Amino acid sequence: MTAASPAKGLIALLRLPYWLMTGGLSVLTAFAITKTMIAPQTILLIFFSMAFITSAGFAINDYFDRESDAVIKPKRPIPAGTLSLKQVVAVSGVLFALGLVMAALINWFSFAIIAVDSLLLLVYSYMVKRKSGFAANILVGILTGTAFMYGQATITSPATVNLVSLSLYPIAFGTIGGNVLRDILSVDGDSKVGYPTLPQKIGRVSAAKVGALFFMLTGLLAPLPYFIGNFTIYYLPLILLWSVLLIYASIRLVTSASTVQNVRKYERIVTMSMILLPLALIAEAVLGGLL
């Protein structure tokens, strides 16, 4: 083991790209809702509180997945030997604590959301993932949706959540669909370690249709914040383009052969098109305040 191995293991454990998906999404939601400047310290607290909780969840999940990862994901920090079990648990505990403290510094409702997220992440890692793969997919979608609620809770006074962030929540359905497709692509490896994923229970063809349903729902409901009057017209162009791509992918998943190649193709389309969501929120935050 090289001296750099623990550092590399820590970086791998944190899953840094997901910080943009959680902390970044919360910050963009806050800006899109308020359409004004937010204090720099509040921005940092929003971003890192959600990001740290996300990494804490990944770390504790790696701890509980250590035996299966040794078989299907041997490069993960624990099976690769770059981090010990005690180190992984310590990192997870520290990150959970930091995330909760930062949320508490914003307001009580932000703390409550982060606390519930933390509990759900522990339940997911310890129990749900091994009992029901599809229930795990649903839970991940629920957790993703809380990023929108968190974004609003951090900038409203008194702290609250209403139709503004709740109208964004259905966007999280796309996360569920994406995880179902990824389960299809990893069905051989999951079967080796006994993960009861949806494709193993109902087959790849039916699972692809389930994933397509969630993409269709996301595509149809993504423009909702505009149509109920919460967001301005500037949110609409990019989000409608994303909706079209999601609906196209969902239709093709149902009408084309559910081969691994096709599933991978449409999963990539959906994944790459997700950049349109933060861009739409940026457009709303920057241009929406002009109306």
Stretches with model-predicted labels:
Residues T2-A12, I78-A159, I251:
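Intramembrane alpha-helical segments
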Residues T2-K8, L224-L291:
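Extended hydrophobic alpha-helices typical of membrane-associated regions
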Residues A12-M21, S84-G93, A135-V140, V205-F215, ...:
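Select subsegments of transmembrane alpha-helices in polytopic membrane proteins
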Residues T22-F64, F96-A104, S110-L122, A159-L181:
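Membrane-embedded alpha-helical segments that form the functional core of polytopic membrane enzymes
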Residues T22-T29, P79, I138-T154, P199-R204, ...:
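Small-residue-rich segments of transmembrane alpha-helices in multi-pass membrane proteins
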Residues L25-A30, G93-M102, D117-L122, M216-L224, ...:
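Hydrophobic core of alpha-helical transmembrane segments in multi-pass integral membrane proteins
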Residues M37, K129-S132, S157-A159, S186, ...:
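Membrane-interface helix-boundary motifs at transmembrane edges
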Residues F48, R66-A115, Y195-F231:
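Multi-pass membrane catalytic core of lipid/isoprenoid biosynthesis enzymes
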